[in-house]
């Protein structure tokens, strides 16, 4: 297998249908497996919830962020209804995350546009958030 094929496998998007009872368990198990493979040493895990309630269909991230914050989530949460992370402050928030956390594992939560057949699906992808350190 060449490097390009390996990268494609690592970035494979998995789809979960929330109307199927076993999907939550399947996605949880997969996410735990991914987190275990990424967490080494003292790497912290943060949850980056992207979106705004000011745009129709874009409130998933801040809604999840608010729910996690109110449930005393073990991970640091960025992006809530009160303090949303959106297009205008996303880059600054990512810089802040990488400044406050050394080599963090970032779980990003965001609504997305996609194919009609994917409406309502929850996706999980092991991929990188793009961040370029200022020179």
Residues of each region from the PLM?
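N-terminal catalytic or cofactor-binding beta/alpha core of small enzyme domains
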Residues: 2-106, 111-130
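Conserved small/polar residues in nucleotide/adenosyl-binding loops
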Residues: 131-135
């Amino acid at each position: 297998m060449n490097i390009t094929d390996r990268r494609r496998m690592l970035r494979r998007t998995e789809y979960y249908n929330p109307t199927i009872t076993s999907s939550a368990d399947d996605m949880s198990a997969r996410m735990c497996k991914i987190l275990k493979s990424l967490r080494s040493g003292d790497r912290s895990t943060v949850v980056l919830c992207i979106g705004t309630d000011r745009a129709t269909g874009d409130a998933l991230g801040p809604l999840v962020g608010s729910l996690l914050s109110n449930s005393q989530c073990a991970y640091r949460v960025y992006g809530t209804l009160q303090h949303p992370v959106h297009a205008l402050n996303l880059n600054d928030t990512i810089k802040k995350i990488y400044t406050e956390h050394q080599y963090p594992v970032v779980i990003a939560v965001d609504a997305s546009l996609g194919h009609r057949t994917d409406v309502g699906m929850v996706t999980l992808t092991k991929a990188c958030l793009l961040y370029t350190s200022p020179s």
